[in-house]
Amino acid sequence: MNFRMEHTMQPLPPEKHEDAEIAAGFLSAMANPKRLLILDSLVKEEMAVGALAHKVGLSQSALSQHLSKLRAQNLVSTRRDAQTIYYSSSSDAVLKILGALSDIYGDDTDAVEEKPLVRKSA
């Protein structure tokens, strides 16, 4: 390969930096085992807060903190019915990332909590 030095020395355009910031925010919001379980649940069905808290094993207070981070990145949406708030996720980006994680770690999302992120070579 013949790389020209002047080409590699050019600074990245501002758009690249902006894209990297957006991607980092997205990945940061997902970078928690409980948030992965929350998103995995919400892409499959809309859920009320109480049911979601029970399903993922969190108090409603702890769940609220996680949902706040996911809402900040627009990874979940809400719907109110009287006094009940329902959450769901239909983000294509979330579906793609969860699909990639499933391909790497298997179909059982609970395995994401149990398996190391880097596999040891044999």
From Swiss-Prot:
Record's keyword terms, sorted: DNA-binding, Nodulation, Repressor, Transcription, Transcription regulation
Signal sequence annotation: none
Classification via CDD domains: HTH_ARSR
DNA-binding region: 49-68
PROSITE patterns: HTH_ARSR_2 (PS50987)
SUPFAM superfamilies reported for this sequence: Winged helix' DNA-binding domain (SSF46785)
Gene Ontology MF terms: DNA binding; DNA-binding transcription factor activity
Keyword set includes Transcription: yes
Domain HTH arsR-type: 15-109
Subunit structure: Binds to the operator site in homodimeric form.
More info: R.meliloti strain 1021 has a frameshift mutation in the nolR gene that disrupt the protein coding region.
Its job: Negative transacting factor controlling the nod regulon. May control the expression of nodD1, nodD2, nodD3 and nodABC genes.
Protein name per its UniProtKB record: Nodulation protein NolR
Gene name for this UniProt entry: nolR
